[in-house]
């Protein structure tokens, strides 16, 4: 600008000759481009536009497919969670049933052992009472025989009874 201003030319001045030659040059360039390059340029632009449209379409299809896959994944995940919860609930139920069954079996065994112990105690008690009764009968017979053998005085009789009762107490203890 400084050089043009120094020569006396201004950028804002219109030179009619320069305008004509600029237009002629522009038209020649446009005609040459139209004849040799315009179809190639338009074809490249059309191909690029078509590629962009195809890419947009593919991206849209992929987005829809991804959304469908996401929904399917979420449905499967929820199904798996429900199934896992059902398995856990069933396992808890089975464990509770097994616990109750084992408790019933254990209680049955304990009751059977208790009943067996009670029977054994009753048998031992009956046997001990039978033996005690036999000893009492034997002692009574012995006492009666001794009493009949000799006539005791009442003091001797009391001492004899106390002695025999002491023997009986020692046997039952």
From Swiss-Prot:
The keyword Cell membrane applies. It is a single-pass membrane protein. It is found in: Cell inner membrane. Its main location: membrane. The keyword Cell membrane applies. InterPro entries: ATP_synth_b/b'su_bac/chlpt (IPR002146), ATP_synth_F0_bsu_bac (IPR005864), ATP_synthase_B_chain (IPR050059). Coiled coil: none annotated. The chain crosses the membrane at residues 12-32. Disulfide bonds: none annotated. Keywords: ATP synthesis, Cell inner membrane, Cell membrane, CF(0), Hydrogen ion transport, Ion transport, Membrane, Transmembrane, Transmembrane helix, Transport. One of its GO terms (molecular function) is proton-transporting ATPase activity, rotational mechanism. PANTHER family: ATP SYNTHASE SUBUNIT B, ATP SYNTHASE SUBUNIT B', CHLOROPLASTIC. F-type ATPases have 2 components, F(1) - the catalytic core - and F(0) - the membrane proton channel. F(1) has five subunits: alpha(3), beta(3), gamma(1), delta(1), epsilon(1). F(0) has three main subunits: a(1), b(2) and c(10-14). The alpha and beta chains form an alternating ring which encloses part of the gamma chain. F(1) is attached to F(0) by a central stalk formed by the gamma and epsilon chains, while a peripheral stalk is formed by the delta and b chains. F(1)F(0) ATP synthase produces ATP from ADP in the presence of a proton or sodium gradient. F-type ATPases consist of two structural domains, F(1) containing the extramembraneous catalytic core and F(0) containing the membrane proton channel, linked together by a central stalk and a peripheral stalk. During catalysis, ATP synthesis in the catalytic domain of F(1) is coupled via a rotary mechanism of the central stalk subunits to proton translocation. Belongs to the ATPase B chain family. This is ATP synthase subunit b. It comes from Leptospira interrogans serogroup Icterohaemorrhagiae serovar copenhageni (strain Fiocruz L1-130). The gene is atpF.
